[in-house]
Amino acid sequence: MEPEYYLDEKDSILWNALVGVVLVAVCGALSGVMKKIPAWALHLLAVLGAVTAVILGIRLARAAGAESIADQYYVQRAAMALADGDAEWVLAQDYYGIYPFQLGLAGSTERLVIQQVQAVCGGITLYVGFRIVRELSGSRAAELLYLVAELLFLPVYCYALFIYGESIGTCSVLCAIWCYLMANRPEGKVWQKGLLWSAVALFMGLAYATRNVLLVVWIAMVIMQILVLLRSKKWQGLPALCVVLAVMLLGKTTLCHMAEGQLDREYGSGAPYVLWVAMGMQENPDALKGPGTYNDYNLDTYLQAGYDSIEAAEVAKGDIRQCLAKWQEDPVAAVTFLKEKLLIQWIEPTYCSFNQTRYQYRPQGWVEDLYTGQANERALAFLNRFQGMVYLAVFGYYLRILLGKLKGVQVLPGIIFLGGFFITILWEAKSRYVYPYIVMILPSAACSMEYYGRLLAGGIGRIAGGIASSRERKQKQKEIGRTA
């Protein structure tokens, strides 16, 4: 099976900055024009955009005939085996446990069924992101910018083909964030807030069941509620988040017990997550894959421990201690390792979406072109520029936080994004793990671009007004001179 390689390509910071200035200027022009557009028109556009995203995702799924590879293969194999009472695949790793039931919801183990469901998740993600923009800023220009950006973000469609938790988990966690923002509105009745917090629990439970690492979002919400408590003395959110955590853990436990009902032995805890942390600290012997990337360490160690989670965890902890001792002796090597590990995850513009869905059975011509032809080259160039603009906007977003321009729940996406960044330091290195955090930060990035666009437009307006006033004064002085 072909491994995941990466290549270094130099980019122009100056060119990215120039494109960024042009985009900010366009946003500034849009800001004035969009004020005349009614809110319902943007809402209708968001619905149409969501439907378009669903259609495009389904169209790609039906035209690609994507085959299951790597983790996807194991997920599907485990689901099908468990349906026949074979527990071996599920026992290997606990996160497989969700997928037999995920596939069972559709009454089929066919890939296309799940891919089409995930395409629907892509449409829901777009619409919910639009509503998040409305909660964060209420700017119609920002809403339009977000809709365009999300529609053009190709990984959303590619991950509809990916039989794993990316599409469903990202969609669920975005829904949870939206409900969380509404629950923290200053207005609203108690029963309304209760329903919203219940929705947060439901969506976070689903997100956690599909992608455990999305626990980061719950932690960010707790930090946010502590900040709310310190600022406004409102404490109700913290007990609500305790209930949310209970639902998340109970949901995962329930799935495990449901799996045990189909097995002849206990489900077990699976491979301990510390194995992934230990693997993420290792130099990969395959230089083309980069440091901290997958090297079979986690499963090999777990198998050698005889599926004993405790013994495997002790081995991993020992390897982590050795690595930390080596870095303590050579801090420069540690910095170099971490720098390269972060770069191969955060500057890869497709976020592994093409790589993870590239195995296809008789794809249609346009799909083949998108993955291997000239369309692929154009897509990579576009996504590279897209990524540069997103990071530029994110930088502007954090600058606004530092300057005190953003307060309250507007800071939540920034806390989540930082949490995702720290996770990629600790975990196995793979740009796929960055994808959910890019989707979650896009609403704030759109708001940031629109904000600086308004600043630029206002500055240009003041300069133009000053020049016009100066000309008028000079003209009046000339007229006074002639009269005298």
Model segments located where?
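Membrane-interface anchor segments at the N-terminal boundary of transmembrane helices
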Residues: 11-16, 112-113, 340-413, 417
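Extracytoplasmic catalytic/substrate-binding loops of multi-pass membrane glycan-assembly enzymes
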Residues: 61-78, 87-112, 268, 312-316
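Loop-to-helix entry region of an early transmembrane alpha helix in multi-pass inner-membrane enzymes
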Residues: 93-97, 107-127, 144, 381-386
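Multi-pass, polyprenyl lipid-linked donor-dependent membrane glycosyltransferases
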Residues: 114-121, 145-175, 180, 207-217, ...
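Transmembrane-helix motifs of polytopic, lipid-linked glycan transferases
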Residues: 116-137, 175, 393-397
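Transmembrane-helix signature of polytopic, membrane-embedded enzymes
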Residues: 129-154, 171, 407-413
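Membrane-interface alpha helices of multi-pass inner-membrane proteins
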Residues: 147, 196-211, 222-223, 244-248, ...
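Membrane-proximal stem/loop segments at transmembrane-domain junctions that anchor or position
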Residues: 260-360
